């Protein structure tokens, strides 16, 4: 087993599965258990950063809230700035917003209007790719400000929920450390 394979195994083993959370029939993949394991957390940051080290990026964007936990250290590892995307009303300067559809309604995200400049090459980082709605809204915000997004990076991909297909449909390739193909 290579060093990278060992790191990926450690990361996957550190993610606890919680049955029937947040509702019956759901098998929740708990990334907070990965955060509790310093070796697994460090490995996840190192692998994500290494994957995009030579990609010519200028900014890392992370979505509230767990995207901050992975996006910020990846940005630091790459020597780049980090831009948070937050729920409405949480950012102090002038923002733009994007609404997106949830299973039972809609939600919204905001980004500072001056955080991305035309031509910025942006990597979106989040803990988990599920349906892709949050990340698509994030990509729309970045593109509205003139940023270029070709990739999004995740610790976990719940492939059975179709997020990767949705991202591909808007021209964004996804990279994940750990794939969970089914419930």
Swiss-Prot record:
Localization, UniProt: Cytoplasm
GO biological process: adenine salvage; AMP salvage; purine ribonucleoside salvage
Protein's name in the database: Adenine phosphoribosyltransferase
Gene3D superfamilies: 3.40.50.2020
Record-listed E.C. numbers: 2.4.2.7
Species for this entry: Sodalis glossinidius (strain morsitans)
Family in the record: Belongs to the purine/pyrimidine phosphoribosyltransferase family.
GO molecular function: adenine phosphoribosyltransferase activity
């Amino acid at each position: 087993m290579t060093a990278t394979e060992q790191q990926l195994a450690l990361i996957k083993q550190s993610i606890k599965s919680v049955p029937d959370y947040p509702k019956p029939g759901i098998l929740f993949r708990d990334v907070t258990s990965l955060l509790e394991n310093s070796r697994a957390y460090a490995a996840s940051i190192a692998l994500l950063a290494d994957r995009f080290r030579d990609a010519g990026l200028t900014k890392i964007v992370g979505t509230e809230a767990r995207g901050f936990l992975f996006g910020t250290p990846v940005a630091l590892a790459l020597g780049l700035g980090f831009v948070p995307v937050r729920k409405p009303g949480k950012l102090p300067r002038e923002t733009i917003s994007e609404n997106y559809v949830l299973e039972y309604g809609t939600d919204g995200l905001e980004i500072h209007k001056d955080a991305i400049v035309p031509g910025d090459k942006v990597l979106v980082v989040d803990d988990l790719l599920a349906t892709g709605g949050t990340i698509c809204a994030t990509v729309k915000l970045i593109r509205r400000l003139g940023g270029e997004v070709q990739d999004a990076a995740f610790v976990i991909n719940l492939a059975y929920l179709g997020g990767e297909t949705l991202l591909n449909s808007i021209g964004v390739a996804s990279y994940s450390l750990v794939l969970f193909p089914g419930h």
